[in-house]
C-alpha cells in the first residue's frame, strides 16, 4: 500500500515521504490517525499545494514540544502513596499517575507521553522518568515517591 506521510512517523519516514507499508498498518493506524493519505495522483497534487502549511504546522508542534521539554527539565514531582515498612508500595505508580502529577504541576502531559521502560514504580524512592513529547523531543523528569 503506497501512502504519503503527512507528519514524521518513527521508523518509517518524514513529512512528504512516499512509503510502501503493509495494508493493515496503513488502514488501521496511519490513515485513521491522519498520519498519512493514499498516494493517488489527486492526493499527491493536493499534498504539494499544502506542503508549506503542513511543514509550518510540524515546526510549530516541535517548537511547542521543546518549550514543554524545557519546563519539564526543571520540574521535580513528588507522589505520595501508601507503603509498607520496607518501602514497598501497596499498588503501583503508573503512567497515568505520573501524567496527572505533571499536569497538576502546571505542564500538560498526556498518559501516552510518559515512558516507563521498566514497568510501573512499585517502591519508594527517586526515579528518572522519560517523557516523549515529539518524535524528536524527549525530556526527563525526576519523580520522587514517598510513603504516606
Curated annotation (Swiss-Prot):
Keywords: Ribonucleoprotein, Ribosomal protein, RNA-binding, rRNA-binding. It comes from the Bacteria. Pfam families: Ribosomal_L9_C, Ribosomal_L9_N. PROSITE patterns: RIBOSOMAL_L9 (PS00651). The keyword RNA-binding applies. GO terms for biological process: translation. One of its GO terms (cellular component) is ribosome. Gene3D superfamilies: Ribosomal protein L9, C-terminal domain, Ribosomal protein L9, N-terminal domain. One of its GO terms (molecular function) is structural constituent of ribosome. Binds to the 23S rRNA. Belongs to the bacterial ribosomal protein bL9 family. This is Large ribosomal subunit protein bL9.
Amino acid at each position: 500500500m503506497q501512502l504519503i506521510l503527512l507528519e514524521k512517523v518513527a521508523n518509517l519516514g518524514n513529512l512528504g515521504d512516499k512509503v510502501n507499508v503493509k495494508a493493515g498498518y496503513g488502514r488501521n493506524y496511519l490513515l485513521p490517525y491522519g498520519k498519512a493519505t493514499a498516494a493517488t495522483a489527486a492526493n499527491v497534487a493536493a499534498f504539494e499545494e499544502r506542503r508549506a502549511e503542513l511543514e509550518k504546522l510540524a515546526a510549530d508542534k516541535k517548537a511547542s514540544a521543546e518549550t514543554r521539554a524545557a519546563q519539564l527539565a526543571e520540574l521535580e514531582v513528588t507522589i505520595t502513596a501508601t507503603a509498607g515498612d520496607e518501602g514497598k508500595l501497596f499498588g503501583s505508580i503508573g503512567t497515568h499517575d505520573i501524567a496527572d502529577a505533571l499536569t497538576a504541576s502546571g505542564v500538560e502531559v498526556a498518559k501516552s507521553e510518559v515512558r516507563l521502560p521498566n514497568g510501573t514504580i512499585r517502591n519508594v524512592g527517586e526515579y528518572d522518568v522519560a517523557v516523549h513529547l515529539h518524535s524528536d523531543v524527549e525530556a526527563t523528569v525526576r519523580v520522587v515517591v514517598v510513603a504516606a
